[in-house]
Amino acid sequence: MKNLTLHQLKVFEAAARHSSFTRAAEELYLTQPTVSIQVKQLTKAVGLPLFEQIGKRLYLTEAGRQLYKTTRQVFEQLEQLDMTIADLQGMKQGQLRLAVITTAKYFIPRLIGPFCQRYPGINVSLKVTNHEGLINRINDNLDDLYVLSRPPSGFDITVQPFLDNPLVVVGPASHPLANQRGISLERLAQEPFILRERGSGTREATEQLFAAHNLNLNVKLDLGSNEAIKQAILGGLGLAVLSYHTLTSAGATPELKMFEVEGFPIHRQWHAVYPAGKQLSTVAATFLDYLLTESQRIAADIQIPESTTTDPELDAPQPVVGV
């Protein structure tokens, strides 16, 4: 493989990641024939087929999978070298790849903004996705850091909690229960509920709480986004359990109200996660340190609701449950 080039590897990495020569060409601002030529030359240098086409889909061969894994490691090391040199020169610059669960979008931008002002040489790539999408990104090692409330089981990962994530009951301000205090779970179980999709940490925590009291949730609808759930609440379809962060700052909606229910809020935390043993880049390590410090500023700005339950076991922080 003496004749391969970094440019060929860059083209191959994009084609493998997208499973498409066309999308790779679009990303790299190249023509599709150019991508095909670069991959063909790389294939010749390797001496084994890198792709196989079945129907209209493009798949990596075993040689292609091994090369893709190695190629990503090569580019990660080159990025790390750039950051290390910049750090030695007294500068912080480079690329931060950050992936977060959808609910984190209500507070993460408030952290990224000041971070970028402090370190103008750092560019941030932020991906927002649901729980399943984030797990896939962790599995594929696509990012530097991941932010979610429920770290997955079955992964060898480093987990760093940094901010409380209380889950609260939300409903229309006009609802008959809106101004009541100490609403029982038994009474709440009579109401229709709108929940996040299956696999969501918020949904699982809610189902666990009701199951612990031998109560069934009346699930009227499940939706894949917090904003869709808010609109469904306003449409009179039911109540919901949401992260308190969705009701603060940019997520605030005057027509919605947090209900005072026994057993709520459910105590969870936000976690920064990355593969165990992974050497964080200078930029990623800088952001993680910043996250642990500045998250306390956000916590101070948010008045976290107190639990209304008299059961100390329910009032205690709940353990993180795996996927």
Curated annotation (Swiss-Prot):
Gene Ontology MF terms: DNA-binding transcription factor activity; transcription cis-regulatory region binding
Chain intervals for the UniProt region annotation (Disordered): 304-323
Keyword Transport: no
Entry's localization field: Cytoplasm
DNA-binding region(s) from the entry: 21-40
A GO cellular component annotation in the UniProt record: cytoplasm
CDD domains tied to this protein: PBP2_CbbR_RubisCO_like (cd08419)
Primary site of residence: cytoplasm
PANTHER family, A to Z: HTH-TYPE TRANSCRIPTIONAL ACTIVATOR CMPR, HTH-TYPE TRANSCRIPTIONAL REGULATOR
Residues in the signal sequence: none
SUPFAM superfamilies hit by this protein: Periplasmic binding protein-like II, Winged helix' DNA-binding domain
Functional description taken from the UniProt entry: Activates transcription of the cmpABCD operon under carbon dioxide-limited conditions.
Annotated InterPro entries: LysR_subst-bd, Tscrpt_reg_HTH_LysR, WH-like_DNA-bd_sf, WH_DNA-bd_sf
Cross-referenced Pfam families: HTH_1, LysR_substrate
Protein known as: HTH-type transcriptional activator CmpR
Domain HTH lysR-type positions: 4-61
Keyword list, A-Z: Activator, Cytoplasm, DNA-binding, Transcription, Transcription regulation
Gene giving rise to this polypeptide: cmpR
PROSITE patterns: HTH_LYSR
Record family assignment: Belongs to the LysR transcriptional regulatory family.
Species in which this protein is naturally found: Synechococcus elongatus (strain ATCC 33912 / PCC 7942 / FACHB-805)
